[in-house]
């Protein structure tokens, strides 16, 4: 397929399947933008765009650690995911035991506390936390949020786990209390809900992708029972919901932005507060089957990723079109507002030569 990519974003095509079993041609587009030096300015296109992520990338051993970056090749996303990976910085570089971090995009916002390293201490019949260790900079994510698997008893074949976040820290079962001293607490807490017990049900606080088995995501994944195996496989179950493709919880999903929005980062960079605007999120895309227009839309990003350590924002767009015969029927794709010569050549039924075109 020939691609005319005027903005120079990264792009790749793949295939997806809907619940009815219909195959779709999917184009995924990703552009990266640098945080501006001037407060309130618009983020500018990066010299080098962040590569598309082909498969989920974990912070450690896959399946036993949190997701750092989730694949860019989801089929569809009804909402826009807001994702942050980075670290907390103490205000003015002064070591602190607790720092509130936050992000605001348009009218949406989320904030929580990042806390210094602590340990559980068993004191007679009770369990207490040590004082937080002061920090200037501290990374955080779901592998340091509340949760985890209680492996204090090596002979337990089915150790208890905090299923909302089995990759986290701080959770334990009461039956292993005697071995709890020295075990780490989470590095993040919900504002107004400090972690004071390993046995309570706390909300894991982070800004990255959630694991695919989390209840509020898994419930959209569909039912894979014997009836599905006998009568539906290899297609999706009828109760599969495309909200499963959202890589963050509902508290980090926003409507797909159709205009530039204000962004504010709190204590996620050394400066303490960063304020800038999203670049124009509207992206015209046109797909062709030979001379037939298969799709002519203005699309909006369904994923915003803030890599605060790199001072970079990435936006991801996607569009899908049902396949009539085969994936090779799609012959041309225009990304961005096309040049006049390209439009005139298409209308005249002629080929258009451009150094910007790629196969």
Give each language-model segment a name.
Residues 2-359:
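Extended intrinsically disordered or low-complexity segments
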């Amino acid at each position: 397929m020939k691609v005319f990519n005027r903005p120079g974003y990264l792009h790749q095509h793949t295939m997806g399947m809907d619940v009815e079993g219909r195959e779709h041609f999917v184009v995924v587009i990703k552009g990266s933008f640098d945080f501006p030096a001037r407060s309130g300015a618009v983020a500018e296109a990066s010299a080098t765009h962040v590569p598309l992520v082909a498969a989920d990338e974990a912070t450690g051993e896959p399946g036993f650690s949190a997701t750092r970056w989730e694949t860019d090749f989801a089929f569809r996303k009804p909402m826009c995911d807001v994702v942050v990976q980075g670290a907390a910085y103490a205000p003015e570089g002064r070591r602190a035991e607790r720092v509130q971090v936050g992000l605001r995009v348009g009218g949406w916002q989320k904030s929580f506390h990042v806390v210094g390293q602590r340990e559980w201490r068993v004191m007679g019949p009770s369990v207490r936390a040590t004082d937080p260790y002061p920090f200037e900079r501290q990374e955080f994510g779901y592998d340091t949020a509340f949760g985890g698997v209680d492996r204090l008893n090596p002979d337990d074949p089915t150790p208890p786990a905090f299923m909302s976040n089995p990759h986290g820290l701080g959770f334990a079962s009461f039956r292993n209390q005697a071995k709890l001293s020295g075990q780490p607490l989470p590095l993040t807490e919900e504002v107004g809900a400090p972690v004071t017990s390993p046995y309570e049900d706390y909300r894991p606080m982070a800004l990255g992708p959630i694991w695919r088995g989390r209840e509020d995501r898994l419930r959209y994944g569909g039912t894979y029972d014997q009836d599905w195996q006998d009568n539906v496989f290899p297609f999706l179950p009828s109760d599969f919901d495309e909200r499963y493709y959202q890589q963050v919880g509902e508290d980090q999903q926003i409507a797909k932005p159709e205009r530039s929005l204000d962004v504010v980062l709190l204590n996620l960079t050394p400066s303490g507060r960063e304020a800038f605007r999203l670049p124009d999120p509207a992206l015209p895309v046109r797909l062709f089957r030979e001379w037939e227009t298969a799709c002519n839309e203005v699309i909006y990003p369904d994923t915003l990723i803030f890599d605060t350590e790199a001072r970079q924002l990435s936006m991801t767009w996607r569009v899908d079109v049902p396949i009539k015969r085969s994936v090779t029927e799609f012959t041309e794709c225009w990304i961005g507002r096309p040049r006049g010569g390209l439009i005139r050549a298409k209308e005249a039924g002629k080929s258009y030569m451009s150094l910007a075109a790629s196969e």
